[in-house]
Amino acid sequence: MGQKINPFGYRLGITENHRSKWFSDSNKVGERYRDFVLEDDAIRKAMSKDLERAGVSRIVIERTRDRVRVDIHTARPGIVIGRRGAEAERVRAKLEKLTGKQVQLNIFEVKNAALDAQLVAQGIAEQLTNRVTFRRAMRKAQQDAMRAGAKGIRIKLSGRLGGAEMSRSEFYREGCVPLQTLRALIDYGFFEAKTTYGRIGVKVWIYKGDMTEREFEEQQAQQSNNRQGRRGDRRPRRGQRNAAPQQNAAAEAPAAAEAPAATETKE
């Protein structure tokens, strides 16, 4: 099964960003790397369970020394906020109890749910739970995504489709979905439909177009600058110690020759 790879991890640093933004090298209990990973997983599971009707697309977690920032991207922000912010306050209090730190809760609205793969997968799963035929649910999701401006969509259902005795997988695809092109903006989502005859897995890939050459080059340049910035405090290698002063002197000589003479103007 070596050909299977996580769609997010495959594109990290190219078209995808990390959804947990923090660093830990501590050995103190509660602040170790594994502790933060388990805590992030618990936060996401709690939010998915409590906000199941809110259409949560993704949850981004950032950490500082004494604060946890949780960004919730949802298609129905009104459900997350609640009446006069009561629901948001309840969620924040629950997260503070879970983490033991001050929690900053930010809620963002997903403008176009038809182009969000996670929300499309949740929509198909809800229809399957409500006994809508799987072919009809897949066809409707495809049509909505293509009308919203997607260049391609791919949907896979796995399980006892239609209540069949033997489980199977069904693929539907419309348009172009280049999964091997790293410059392609591919959005991926997964959700499980809980039906009376078992669970059905729903996977959705939505192709939104390629990154332009300029965007790709800018992103690569920014990443290389970040890597060089992290290495700036290192000592030069042995072969580079003597070459560095010579290079600096050679670079300063042409600059001095090309610089125009200063002129003084009097009024």
Curated annotation (Swiss-Prot):
Record field: compositional bias (Basic residues): 228-240
Start and end residues of each stretch annotated as Disordered: 216-267
Protein's UniProt keywords contain S-adenosyl-L-methionine: no
Keywords: Ribonucleoprotein, Ribosomal protein, RNA-binding, rRNA-binding
Membrane-crossing residue ranges in chain numbering: none
GO molecular function, one term: rRNA binding
Ranges in coiled-coil conformation: none
Composition-biased stretches (Low complexity): 241-267
One GO cellular component term: cytosolic small ribosomal subunit
Pfam families xrefs: KH_2, Ribosomal_S3_C
Domain KH type-2: 43-111
SUBUNIT field: Part of the 30S ribosomal subunit. Forms a tight complex with proteins S10 and S14.
Function: Binds the lower part of the 30S subunit head. Binds mRNA in the 70S ribosome, positioning it for translation.
Protein name (database record): Small ribosomal subunit protein uS3
UniProt source species: Bifidobacterium adolescentis (strain ATCC 15703 / DSM 20083 / NCTC 11814 / E194a)
Gene behind this protein: rpsC
